Amino acid sequence: MIGEVIVVGDLKLRDSASVDEYDRLGERMYEIVSNLSGFQSVKSFKAEDGEEITIFRFASEEALELWRTHPEHVETMRRGHAEFYTSGFLQVCKVIREIGPFKHE
């Protein structure tokens, strides 16, 4: 939808990162974000080299701000930089044009 906010995270885990703890925190973050007003969806894709792309969709910048400033999310982001990620970046994008949805039979 026009005006939606899309956040793309491109992150790579450290070789020394605890995958079990990372997965546990990811599940907790999903519990939180999925209950916030304006959250629409999240999907993650992992490449063979360990790079992970995550795409969040929010109804508005205000909805994203609820997530960005949530205390548990803030602490998890801090831990991510300190314990889990070797590199990465986030992009925050606003939908300005949309084609579809469409379905081929």
Pin down the residues of each PLM region.
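Short S/T/G/P-rich N-terminal loop/turn motif that feeds into the first structured element of a domain
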Residues: 1-52, 61-69, 86-105
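Alpha-helical structural motif
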Residues: 25, 76-77
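C-terminal end-helix/capping segment
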Residues: 77, 81-85, 89
